[in-house]
Amino acid sequence: MFEAVTNCEVSIEFVKEENTTIYLNVIPKLIIDVVYAYGNMPTENQMISGDNYLVKEQNNGHMLFAISDGMGKGYSAFYESDMTLHLVEDIIKLNIDPSTALTILNTFYVVQDYLERYATLDFLDINRHNGNATFYKMGANTTYIFKQNKMVDKIINQSLPLGIDEEVDQSSYQLEDGDMIIMSSDGVVENLIDNDLLEEFISNAKDLAPQQIVYEILNYTIKNQIKTKDDMTVIVLKISTRKKK
């Protein structure tokens, strides 16, 4: 009954009994684990990257990952993307769900569009209780999900950066054991002539640790380009399911 209501596995803990009333705690179980790593590299001739990233593990069993790419390069781009992620984090701290938080943030950017400053946002919310992943994309790069069976699923951006579209692009995806998620800023793929070769390269590196995969992706991009045209940020996540006891 409890699992039907909560849509996830639960454990029941006895708290106390008073007269004819029994008090129980219903605790959702975590069914997936997430191992992750991230890396960032500025464009040529820049001391600082215009990309920023956010990784946050919440007490409610959710994990949040985000990449923001500020308009332009250098400190101005860094400031814009850094402010974007700080605003996201501040709104979520108010116990507002990510979907509402990002709608509020997007509205804020719509209102202040006269500033002519924009940032992309690639946001991922993973529910570790039921394995559901929700992707929010606002001008963001494609996210790749590498499967155990060698297939690759893609979450493709359908909207413009924050403050330009009134709607927030949102997609749900059910994660499975062995999935590997690659989030990146557009500097990674824009530098390459053939993105299919990058997919093949990542697929062959799938058995490596997440941090090593981050390094390999950045190094591959550098070696297979003429010039670093944009900042590059990569987040690699590996999903594993817990065995039922």
Spans of features found by a protein language model:
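Core mixed alpha/beta domains of very large multi-subunit molecular machines
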Residues: 2-61
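Catalytic core of PPM/PP2C metal-dependent serine/threonine phosphatase domains
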Residues: 3-22, 29, 78-148, 223-228, ...
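Intrinsically disordered or compositionally simple regulatory linkers and C-terminal tails
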Residues: 23, 241-245
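PP2C/PPM family metal-dependent serine/threonine protein phosphatase catalytic domain
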Residues: 28-52, 106-110, 139-172, 218-219
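Acidic loop->beta-strand submotif enriched in PP2C/PPM serine/threonine phosphatases
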Residues: 46-59, 121, 154-193, 227
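Short hydrophobic-aromatic micro-motifs
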Residues: 63-66, 135, 181-184
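Active-site-proximal, acidic helix/loop segment immediately C-terminal to a metal-coordinating Asp/Glu
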Residues: 72-94, 153, 179-228, 243
